[in-house]
Amino acid sequence: MAFLNTNQKHNICMKTEQILTALEAKHQGEKEYLQAVREVLQSIEPVYNEHPEFERVRLVERLVEPDRILTFRVPWVDDHGDVNINIGYRVQFNNAIGPYKGGIRFHPSVNLSILKFLGFEQTFKNALTTLPMGGGKGGSDFAPRGRSEAEIM
């Protein structure tokens, strides 16, 4: 394995920084997701530096963007007869080694950035198991705590 000179190392580090800068411009305000991507890029940079073929196939860019995102409304009727509408999401990140797998989160703080962060990390968690599963995550800003069975159903 050949060692890289300082200029080559700087250029490659700049490449991951360019990927992150482009991602930040595209996904402004998604702080949880961008922080997760930043941490992963920092940790994989030494391996990325040793394998120029990863850049050729744009491996990092393919990993950091979800395959698809579904956004939908969740209308429901509370015990008082009032109609409420929450937002639901399903982020499907990567199915390169198998079908998307990831849980569901229900909490008022749920937003797209949080689910992208969780789906991104789920991809790596699943890859570390011996089961062929990709990564995804779903959820809604619906708060089930304190709701009746009828409201949750």
Language model regions located:
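Short, Lys/Arg-enriched N-terminal segments with co-localized hydrophobic residues
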Residues: 1-13
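N-terminal ligand-binding/catalytic initiation module
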Residues: 13-153
